[in-house]
Amino acid sequence: MEPPSPQDEGLRKKQPKKPVPEILPRPPRALFCLTLQNPLRKACISIVEWKPFETIILLTIFANCVALAVYLPMPEDDNNTLNLGLEKLEYFFLIVFSIEAAMKIIAYGFLFHQDAYLRSGWNVLDFIIVFLGVFTVILEQVNIIQTNTAPMSSKGAGLDVKALRAFRVLRPLRLVSGVPSLQVVLNSIFKAMLPLFHIALLVLFMVIIYAIIGLELFKGKMHKTCYFIGTDIVATVENEKPSPCARTGSGRPCTINGSECRGGWPGPNHGITHFDNFGFSMLTVYQCISMEGWTDVLYWVNDAIGNEWPWIYFVTLILLGSFFILNLVLGVLSGEFTKEREKAKSRGTFQKLREKQQLEEDLRGYMSWITQGEVMDVDDLREGKLSLDEGGSDTESLYEIEGLNKIIQFIRHWRQWNRVFRWKCHDLVKSKVFYWLVILIVALNTLSIASEHHNQPLWLTHLQDVANRVLLTLFTIEMLMKMYGLGLRQYFMSIFNRFDCFVVCSGILEILLVESGAMSPLGISVLRCIRLLRLFKITKYWTSLSNLVASLLNSIRSIASLLLLLFLFIIIFALLGMQLFGGRYDFEDTEVRRSNFDNFPQALISVFQVLTGEDWNSVMYNGIMAYGGPTYPGVLVCIYFIILFVCGNYILLNVFLAIAVDNLAEAESLTSAQKAKAEERKRRKMSKGLPDKSEEERATVTKKLEQKSKGEGIPTTAKLKIDEFESNVNEVKDPYPSADFPGDDEEDEPEIPVSPRPRPLAELQLKEKAVPIPEASSFFIFSPTNKIRVLCHRIVNATWFTNFILLFILLSSAALAAEDPIRADSMRNQILEYFDYVFTAVFTVEIVLKMTTYGAFLHKGSFCRNYFNILDLLVVAVSLISMGLESSAISVVKILRVLRVLRPLRAINRAKGLKHVVQCVFVAIRTIGNIVLVTTLLQFMFACIGVQLFKGKFYSCNDLSKMTEEECRGYYYIYKDGDPTQIELRPRQWIHNDFHFDNVLSAMMSLFTVSTFEGWPQLLYKAIDSNEEDTGPVYNNRVEMAIFFIIYIILIAFFMMNIFVGFVIVTFQEQGETEYKNCELDKNQRQCVQYALKARPLRCYIPKNPYQYQVWYVVTSSYFEYLMFALIMLNTICLGMQHYNQSEQMNHISDILNVAFTIIFTLEMVLKLIAFKPRGYFGDPWNVFDFLIVIGSIIDVILSEIDTFLASSGGLYCLGGGCGNVDPDESARISSAFFRLFRVMRLVKLLNRAEGVRTLLWTFIKSFQALPYVALLIVMLFFIYAVIGMQMFGKIAMVDGTQINRNNNFQTFPQAVLLLFRCATGEAWQEILLACSYGKLCDPESDYAPGEEHTCGTNFAYYYFISFYMLCAFLIINLFVAVIMDNFDYLTRDWSILGPHHLDEFKAIWAEYDPEAKGRIKHLDVVTLLRRIQPPLGFGKFCPHRVACKRLVGMNMPLNSDGTVTFNATLFALVRTALKIKTEGNFEQANEELRAIIKKIWKRTSMKLLDQVIPPIGDDEVTVGKFYATFLIQEHFRKFMKRQEEYYGYRPKKDTVQIQAGLRTIEEEAAPEIHRAISGDLTAEEELERAMVEAAMEEGIFRRTGGLFGQVDNFLERTNSLPPVMANQRPLQFAEIEMEELESPVFLEDFPQNPGTHPLARANTNNANANVAYGNSSHRNNPVFSSICYEREFLGEADMPVTREGPLSQPCRASGPHSRSHVDKLKRPMTQRGMPEGQVPPSPCQVTGAKAEHPVQKEGKGPTSRFLETPNSRNFEEHVPRNSAHRCTAPATAMLIQEALVRGGLDSLAADANFVMATGQALADACQMEPEEVEVAATELLKQESPEGGAVPWEP
């Protein structure tokens, strides 16, 4: 390839970074023939890489889009001249794009080498579009030729061309490749695709399960409706849609006279919405999940089969599908987006913004300093002047002579005055007074604009006009002053000033234009509203708000690219919609469909409507009907809408939220810096201004402030505010915490001590303590020691009392819900009234007791000083007053009765978790303050603009031909259903739209409903049709008005509302963390620790019985799994194949299949029961689930058999709902329908199979666990609102065709709750609001006075519904989202950090070592276990042995007396070291602190478990750490000896030297290493590297010296050929493991040719004794013989498997002293706990000279291994190695070792006699000396050290 020319280089430098057309490295040859020298290719390259070329192409694409948009689709392939012209133009575009593609292919090559044309995704897209375009043209030509030959076929042939032409709409996508910022957004969406795919699977799964359940339960139920008898006319009331009915049962009866219920109706929505077959069932379920129109479906089902239970189906569907699963999308997207943004941020964008701010501040400071300097100059000059004048001088006269001097003088004076004046002006402009004046003027301006309304009096209009001019003048003056005072440059530096200038100039321009008559006043009066933005000037002195605004402006950048993407998306779908549905939305019923695709603007609006999800289903139904209804081609239409809805609504709109959440965090980080400064100042003030307080108090204050300013985690305002809130919750704003109340246990948790010495647990009071009686007297009579008061205190603080009161609160709440709202004096209400007296009495007594105990309110800590107590008092007082006022004014009583609803709130004070959530909500509300302000301002501004645009224009006459109120009189005819035979006479009415813009308040109300996405299309079309004031609408009069609504929706509903939601989420997450702020564990650590404490080992059951084993083998094999999987899938398909009106044969087949599947699944259950035995089978929750399903299925089969039998025998129908000739389809036979569900539930088993979905499910359940208090709060909210609703709106009559009807009303409590649930999902809540406002018809049974039948409902409905909607939509549902995002952060988290999901692996692998789930394994197995688990939890198989040992020293699990470690302790130690939880510093202290933390967070942890996991202080546990520490020391000795040998070439003979050197290794090498291991400092990479190298170097040593403890004689290794023992276990599993492990070279060192310790031996599950005898570990290459013999003797000969023979058993028998009797002797002292700690037992040491000749004994390194293997190693001193009787660490050696350890910093180990002894043994072994020799040498050494030369007495 030729070198690039210099001009190429230059080009390359100049070219800015464009993603696609970068200069690609060009291949030497393109299309196999064109080289780089080829002139054609050279030309192509230069053109393609020419800068303007890209621009030209982009412009062409843009032009093409315009051409596509102008095209007018017509029905039936009609055309007009414009369309024909555009088709010609299409050829031009096609040619341009073809040329572009061809040139790029020539320049870059086509496909085969890197960077070829088709290697880029965008180019592939281009190529496909161009190719299809060319293909279409060819087809068209073919069609034309065909048409000429055979004119008949033209219609058919044209179709495929039309379909292909639709691909043109993808061209706008090419714009993406031209805009880099778009690609960030797209990238983050693409990155999120994988987790989104999992979620999509989960959603699909939900939809399938619910669709099949729907199919089973509601199949064919929707086809009956009310017809007039003998006709096909559907009987409906006015405004009512036809809906299903039921002849019998509890469905809807036909009430209209002369109507009957019969079948043959296609069904609701022209037969699209039903559950008759799987496809439509899925569509209906999906529509419900999208929360649009789900209530309609529910009400239809209710009408068809009764309302007892269908709500369960729909409500669970909404809760699971909409609230949970679909919010996962948000979790994933925001995670991905934040990551993408992090990358961008690391490039420093945000830093720049900060620096810029800093620079501006500096510059301002500098400018003001300079100007001040100038002024001072002036002052000095002035003073100088005067002195000159006073002195007087002749020279002045000389100046006077010259004429110039006066002018010069004047100019100089003028300059000085100008400077002074400008400085003064600058001061004035900068002063607070000026600022507040401006704010006042802005407020007046706002007032004058807001006072405009429809039909306002003339004087007001005049006043507004004058005010407008005056204010404009004032603003102009302000602007000029600023310009003069600050100088132009500094003035225009501020964005606000630029904006101000723009507003003022536009105002002046407006007045000039209106005065000169060049413009109508309206058009520009909208500009007047922009002045309202001036309100944002407040932000100048309000830092958090100004930062929020800055952050919003900042995120507008990221949102701009998203908007562009959204816009492209909308354009593409609008163009596609025009191709598909243009001109097709005209139906027979002559009703105009407003949301159609007949032209481009209209298509845009329709697509936007589907995107916001409002009524998208009705647009889809129209689309299906346009293609011939719910039959073959029509149904495919739904694909278009579903893709549009999913991509738009779920993905793009959630990215909005992701961006919002992201930018908020940034706004906070700006604020926090300023906050910190303020805190600093405050702290200084505080510490200065506390002279009267004691030192201690002052310290607490400053400490509090410090804590505040620190605020761990993301420093956000939310965080800081939360701190303030927490510290002020129970305080009267004083800096020290107030006394607590019994329920108020915020502060009574133990503080974790900060002192260096840990406090023992006893001092950390973990019990919730009662609040003491305050010092002051209560009611001035009861002193603190008064008997009565003490008794009251005891009662109030008793737990039974609290529970008793809670019970009464619950009962009284239930009584409220049970009231009958319609018949006020019914029997039920009278009984409840008596109950009410009882409740009130109890609550009054409670309050009196509490007041007696704590005093009323005069002193600190008294009853009324706590907000929650005041709430209690208020509730009780209301009850008492309402009882007293029974007779007086009704309205007051009514209000008071409604206030009783607050009773359940008293539970908050009693339940701690609930209280926390409520505080969370309060904090959230306070934090959201700023956002609410900004949103309200924007809303207000839009409302003002709306008033200008639409006031008085939303009137209409119901007879559309009349345009004004005068004309709209008399009667007019109407044809029912467009049928000319049915004529009806109706009176004309002049109607005002319910939502309108006649004044600012109603405008804000209308806009609020728009921002909730409910009913906005109707309002939009009203606005589009609006004409003049007080006249009727004109169809499509002002389409441009849609811009107002779309901008509003994007700005407020997409952006601000999402920021709102984002803020709530961020706040809740912060709040969740604050709860644990003092416990020093972050969320992940908490989760892992909790898992480690709660986890239990799995049973890995292998049956012993050979037949049972065969079954077990089959059941646990993977093939069996796959078979069941396939069967479940088949079952699903069979269930999905059922449909309504299926043939008899089909019915028969499905019945047979059902029986077959039931038999198969029963068989599976039986097999598993045989294999696992009942105990093992029911241990797994999935099996329990299986079992229930099988039982249910069997019942279902039996029932259906009985059914068919009864049906065939023609007998009575006796199932569900009594006997009688009942149509089986009619009655909602919950009995058999319920059992049918079991068929469907088998599907749920599939969830257990897919890994990703399983994790999703697991987290799902986790988030449910996190929700109890949130759920409780939601329940409370619903309860309170439902009861209020019953009291206020219960009397409204139910009228079909209105929103308060048979399915939707407030007459019973369950109905009220369902209605509220509907409002929470946003289903037409604004219409329910209108239906509950004043002036509605009353229920005939209610107690209204005559003539008052239209007085029900109340305008309180506005407050009621708006407050409920806001609470629900912005707080409650976001609680769901916050919890989910919290739990799902793992989807996008960093997998290298240990998290709870890693811990399952540990459980699974542990089970192989501990199949019986005893919870213990041999400590020697721990290393193998951990090497099998991958990091971050385990060590991984490539971890060198020494590093593994060092990590074990750091983990330091407690070791049981039988040499085992426990499950929880091991897991806990792993978690602790992996996450570095309290591993630094003094280990014992850290342990104690950690114990306290665990007790604080997990109060129910049993002390036994806690001691097992973290041994308490003073418990001289033997731990794995100490064991491996001796091992490491020994290794160092060995290395040291090796070095010695290499150095001297032989062994140095002098004992003392050797020992000294050995001790030095302890001190200098081993100790620091162990120290590091203990403090967990092992992560250093180089450490690992070094260890790996060392391991490799020492391979020789390892091999020679065998395994863990010292050298093993080679002859033993040769002869030790034990046969591997396999006791009927499954070879398959373990063989795999063994191969895997042996791949690692490091591993091989640990497996000498010794089959007995082969990994297979581990599987020795059934011979427990063999396990014990052999220690069964892959690390025991030298099964430490002495210890084994010893152990075997303990076990007794009988326990030994007899079959074992071989050299191993010989030495044991040979060794004389170790005969049975000897062991018995040794056993005796073991049973008593003997000597004081640390004292060496004399007996074994005195028996010197026992037979030590036996080679085995000499080599057996007893101590180190033994002190782990002997039972009861706590008093290890009692059984020192007795196998070699003289092997004792004698006093002198021990002293030296202790000294060395202390010097090495291992004091705790030095104090441990066991450890010292083991080390002494290791020292002797390494030096190859007898202990006596070591002792002699040691004594010599001590003599040299001590001055007297005598041996120092040894006291450990």
Curated annotation (Swiss-Prot):
III repeat feature ranges: 768-1068
The short motif Selectivity filter of repeat IV is annotated over 1321-1324
| GO terms for MF | calmodulin binding; high voltage-gated calcium channel activity; metal ion binding; voltage-gated calcium channel activity
**Which residues are recorded as modified (Phosphothreonine)?**
1579
List the PANTHER family: VOLTAGE-DEPENDENT CALCIUM CHANNEL TYPE A SUBUNIT ALPHA-1, VOLTAGE-DEPENDENT L-TYPE CALCIUM CHANNEL SUBUNIT ALPHA-1S
Q: Which family does it belong to?
A: Belongs to the calcium channel alpha-1 subunit (TC 1.A.1.11) family. CACNA1S subfamily.
Q: Which disease is it linked to?
A: Defects in Cacna1s are the cause of muscular dysgenesis (MDG), a lethal autosomal recessive disorder in which there is total lack of excitation-contraction coupling in homozygotes, and which results in complete skeletal muscle paralysis. A single nucleotide deletion yields a protein with an altered and truncated C-terminus.
User: What name does this protein carry?
Assistant: Voltage-dependent L-type calcium channel subunit alpha-1S
Per the UniProt record, the source organism is Mus musculus
